[in-house]
């Protein structure tokens, strides 16, 4: 029983970091357009993702898709781009 309490406390203290696979977005809900995977990989990793790729002819056109992107980085939400 004591072990269960200690493990629970350790998890609460450590916190849980989550990440998501998503299209990285600018503050105006516009995606980053791309032509090369290397551009997206650099952009995504600089923002804390594990990696990134250029998703050609995807949902949002040619846009950067990041893998394991932290929750504090903006992603493309449904709705229009507000340029």
UniProtKB/Swiss-Prot annotation:
SMART domains: Knot1 (SM00505). Disulfide bonds join 30-81, 34-54, 40-64, 44-66. It comes from the Eukaryota. One of its GO terms (biological process) is defense response. Pfam families: Toxin_3. GO terms for cellular component: extracellular region. SUPFAM superfamilies: Scorpion toxin-like. GO terms for molecular function: sodium channel inhibitor activity; toxin activity. Its main location: secreted. Coiled coil: none annotated. The keyword Disulfide bond applies. PROSITE patterns: LCN_CSAB. Expressed by the venom gland. Residues 1-18 form the signal peptide. The keyword Cytoplasm does not apply. Belongs to the long (4 C-C) scorpion toxin superfamily. Sodium channel inhibitor family. Alpha subfamily. This is Toxin AahP985. It comes from Androctonus australis (Sahara scorpion).
